[in-house]
């Protein structure tokens, strides 16, 4: 069993006085961060958190969440990171599925039969000496993050210490490291993209400028004045920043904008080239511990729409009906690497279906060009990407079908200037119901970003001979609106 020194403890030993985290007016060194984490460990130990247990974390970006995530790794517990934008019903389902022993949160939450510990109350309570892991086994689970499958049923992706380590190493081999690097972190840490920055922070010894909540004005100013060298963004954020930048440009010290959540439109990339802003487009998912492919800034205009090539220790191919296909042939994107999950929690069926001989079948469609650059054609075919959040129509359809006046339901993405896409619903009625009532019904059961922005009524939904819903025809109806 391969082990490594506890990452934060080792970093605090190697560079104790180096700045680890900046948040608002607070600066914390790696040694100070380690000391904070030990204190959280002792409080969590008092409330009964032990090695091997799964603990749900429902917190917003901030020093408190950072210390909780590290503290759980210190005691050997698995952090189940919950999306703060989900509804109570969705969160309860995930906690039950993950078999968590308690919830640590910074907000009011009634978790029924699961003990809920307010971070503030825990830290004001008694301490107990903690048994701290001085080494991590790379094979052990560190986190579980839920991702929706093509059926809409969430699956808990198990990411090991080895997965997180490989992801950080792959990123460093791709982007390089500098002594003056500072990564501006504005992505939620309950997403793997945001979480991966915490791993890089302690592994690289790199300063993180943490933004608790997305604030385009603050981020724009920080890029100009705070010595930021790298930032992770999605297309909407990039558009927001360019609007604020106007005729100016950012300092040359900004060496990378890492763009996820789908490719950027060519006009935006052209503007970035004119202003000397290096945009690295990426492709990844929870199952790959963040990015697995990156298109470097060298190719941002010559390979428009491409997600680039795999990270150094990763492999990628395109398969159709189980056969590897040549360049320019569309098929399923299949990936392999030490950053790829070994499977889903308590979902052996989904694990067997998705991971075969170490290769992860993403369900995404794409092709490779003659030079091996990846082009993603469809994100898991029916996926709606809204402001960087993944939305699966099947989950919304399940909610719609639970309404007594709904006989059939179909959901597709509708183009939106602000969010990229938003859900649009098509409904066949079995009783009297209005569009407003449908939307209000969804608001009570779904996260806000998953609620359909439009509900249209049809006599029947388009289906093929096998009665399978023809979403492409629904998309055509949306385009004709």
UniProtKB/Swiss-Prot annotation:
- Pathway(s) this gene product operates in, as recorded in its UniProt entry: Quinol/quinone metabolism; 1,4-dihydroxy-2-naphthoate biosynthesis; 1,4-dihydroxy-2-naphthoate from chorismate: step 5/7; Quinol/quinone metabolism; menaquinone biosynthesis
What InterPro entries does the entry give?
AMP-bd_C, AMP-bd_C_sf, AMP-binding_CS, AMP-dep_synth/lig_dom, ANL_N_sf, MenE
Q: List the disulfide bonds.
A: none
- GO:BP terms for this protein? fatty acid metabolic process; menaquinone biosynthetic process
Q: Which reaction is the catalytic activity of this chain?
A: 2-succinylbenzoate + ATP + CoA = 2-succinylbenzoyl-CoA + AMP + diphosphate
Q: Known CDD domains for this protein?
A: OSB_CoA_lg (cd05912)
Q: Which UniProt keywords apply?
A: ATP-binding, Ligase, Menaquinone biosynthesis, Nucleotide-binding
Enzyme type, top EC level? ligase
Recorded hits in SUPFAM superfamilies, A to Z, give: Acetyl-CoA synthetase-like
Query: What Pfam families does this protein map onto?
Result: AMP-binding, AMP-binding_C
Keyword presence, DNA repair: no
**Is ATP-binding set as a keyword in this record?**
yes
What Enzyme Commission number does this protein have? 6.2.1.26
A GO molecular function for this record?
Answer: medium-chain fatty acid-CoA ligase activity
Checking PANTHER family in the record gives: ACYL-COA SYNTHETASE, MEDIUM-CHAIN ACYL-COA LIGASE ACSF2, MITOCHONDRIAL
Instruction: Tell me which HAMAP family the record gives.
Output: MenE
| Family statement drawn from the similarity comment of this UniProt entry | Belongs to the ATP-dependent AMP-binding enzyme family. MenE subfamily.
Role, per record: Converts 2-succinylbenzoate (OSB) to 2-succinylbenzoyl-CoA (OSB-CoA).
Specify the protein name: 2-succinylbenzoate--CoA ligase
Provenance organism? Bacillus cereus (strain AH187)
- Its gene? menE
């Amino acid at each position: 069993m391969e082990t490594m020194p506890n990452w934060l403890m080792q970093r605090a030993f190697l560079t104790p006085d180096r700045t680890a985290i900046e948040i608002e007016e607070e600066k914390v060194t790696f040694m100070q961060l380690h000391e904070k984490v030990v204190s959280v460990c002792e409080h969590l130990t008092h409330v009964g958190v032990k090695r091997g247990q799964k603990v749900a974390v429902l917190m917003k970006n901030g020093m408190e969440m950072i210390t909780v995530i590290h503290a759980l790794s210190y005691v050997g517990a698995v952090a189940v990171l919950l999306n703060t934008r989900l509804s109570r019903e969705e969160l309860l389902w995930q906690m039950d599925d993950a078999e968590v022993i308690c919830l640590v949160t910074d907000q009011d939450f009634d978790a029924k039969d699961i003990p809920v510990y307010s971070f503030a109350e825990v830290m004001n309570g008694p301490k107990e000496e903690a048994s701290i892991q001085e080494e991590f086994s790379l094979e052990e689970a560190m986190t579980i993050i839920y991702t929706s499958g093509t059926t809409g049923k969430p699956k808990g992706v198990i990411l090991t210490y080895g997965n997180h380590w490989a992801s950080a190493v792959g990123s460093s081999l791709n982007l390089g490291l500098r002594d003056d690097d500072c990564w501006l972190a504005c992505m939620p840490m309950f997403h793997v993209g945001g979480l991966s920055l915490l791993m890089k922070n302690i592994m690289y010894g790199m300063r993180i400028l943490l933004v608790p909540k997305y604030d385009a004005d603050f981020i724009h100013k920080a890029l100009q004045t705070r010595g930021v060298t790298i930032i992770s963004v999605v297309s909407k954020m990039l558009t927001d920043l360019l609007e604020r930048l106007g005729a100016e440009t950012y300092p040359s010290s900004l060496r990378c904008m890492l763009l996820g959540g789908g490719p950027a439109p060519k006009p935006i990339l052209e503007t970035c080239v004119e202003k000397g802003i290096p945009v690295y487009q990426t492709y990844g998912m929870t199952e790959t511990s963040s990015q697995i492919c990156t298109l470097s800034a060298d190719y941002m205009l010559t390979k428009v729409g491409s997600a680039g090539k795999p990270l150094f220790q990763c492999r990628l191919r395109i398969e159709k009906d189980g056969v590897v296909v040549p360049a320019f042939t569309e098929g399923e994107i299949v990936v392999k690497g030490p950053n790829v999950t070994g499977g889903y929690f308590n979902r052996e069926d989904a694990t067997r279906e998705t991971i075969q001989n170490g290769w992860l079948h993403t369900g995404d469609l794409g092709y490779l060009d003659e030079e091996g650059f990846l082009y993603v054609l469809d994100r898991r075919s029916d996926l709606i990407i809204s402001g960087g959040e993944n939305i699966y129509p099947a989950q919304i359809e399940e909610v719609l079908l639970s309404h007594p006046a709904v006989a059939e339901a179909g959901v597709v993405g509708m183009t939106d200037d602000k969010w990229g896409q938003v859900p649009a619903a098509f409904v066949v009625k079995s009783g009297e119901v209005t569009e407003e009532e449908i939307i209000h019904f969804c608001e009570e059961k779904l996260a806000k970003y998953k609620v359909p922005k439009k509900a249209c009524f049809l006599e029947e939904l388009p289906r093929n001979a096998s009665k399978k819903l023809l979403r492409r025809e629904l998309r055509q109806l949306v385009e004709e609106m």
